Amino acid sequence: MLGAFEGSNMIAQEVTVRIADTNWESIKLARMDNIPTYYGNPMSEHAGRTVDLSLYGTVLVISPYKQLNPLVTYHFEHELGKGAALGLSVNDSQKRASHQVSESYASKLCLFNEDMTYAKLAGYTSKGGKIKTTRLSDEFSYEDYEIEYQQRSIVLCAIEPNGKVRMFTSLKNIQPKSDWRIISLITENKKTDYIVFDKNSLNPST
């Protein structure tokens, strides 16, 4: 996973991951939570020698580093295979003609849902969002789950009984079944509007 912030650290507490970032403060927070990390450029030769990619099937590009994200995406798709690197949507300003991303790259920006940007995700966690794992059952189906949490959650991934992790994206229609676990970012409020940070306030280290 490229990008360490409160939300990614919470995801890592539920799913086996390694977080990579060039921001030492973010890496330090992840290490305090005993999450495996890589401090530095994940595309570097050093990363290639020290990180065993065979342990990971998917790379999630969850970072504000807009110039680095496409490079990371294509690098790991080359290493792991087509569709193995997923990123967040771009913001409205990037959709102008002068900032238009390529159709090929845009097709990979589908993580969680079609309009989930880094700023929205970070804003959601700043409003008290917490990671919650819910096990489905015959008595509490995914339809029941959506009714209960839809207005105050972002569904992140589902874990099958055999341990397989399936990420929610705008391109795949996952139909979770009984005994699956759903991992979501949920707020206490019954309905939560996104807080959107100004990109300058995120102040990532590059």
Label each region the model flagged.
Residues M1-T206:
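Cytosolic regulatory regions of ion transport systems
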